[in-house]
Design a protein with these regions (language model features):
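Iron-associated oxidoreductase/ferritin-like identity signal
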Residues: 1-159
């Protein structure tokens, strides 16, 4: 993969991850009023996503690029708006939307890793992307677990 194409892909991830940081921080603030533990989980996920932002920004710079200024401005605002909107729509809707967003990130990470492995290039970048991918899977599993808990609680109320 040529450098220009790789930088475009890394900028996509940079913007996506920036969006997720503010999305999950907004949700953390909303849901911690319902349940402190829930707020802490969203906050922790946001901090992990911030680590992804930092790692991707570092790789962009190592390749001679600069993290996109548009991403720095637009993604956080979109993340806050989406986080607040989804949070106000309720926990179940937020969890489902988050799961969908994480699934997109997983799919995109897998494709980029596959492309880089095919080229047999950028082993350090592949490792960073693989670590991010593991985190995205963990986030998805947590969202799924919380959805299952909500569904079980709903079923108990029916009985």
């Amino acid at each position: 993969m040529n450098k220009k194409r790789l930088l475009i892909k890394l900028h996509w991830f940079y913007t996506l991850e920036l969006n997720q940081v503010d999305l999950y921080m907004a949700q953390s603030k909303i849901f911690k009023n319902q349940d402190k533990k829930l707020g802490l989980f969203f906050e922790r996920i946001a901090l992990i996503e911030q680590n992804h932002v930092d790692n991707i920004a570092k790789k962009i710079r190592e390749l001679g690029g600069n993290p996109t200024r548009l991403g720095d401005i637009v993604a956080p605002n979109l993340g806050k708006i989406a986080g607040n909107t989804m949070g106000l729509s309720g926990l179940k809707i937020a969890l489902k939307a988050n799961r969908l967003l994480e699934s997109k990130a997983i799919s995109d990470y897998e494709l980029l890793i596959k492309d880089l492995e095919k080229d047999n290039s950028h082993p350090e970048l592949i490792k960073v992307l693989e670590h991010n991918l593991v985190d995205e899977h963990l986030h998805t599993a947590w969202f799924e677990q919380e959805l299952n808990i909500l569904n079980k609680q709903k079923q108990k109320k029916r009985l």
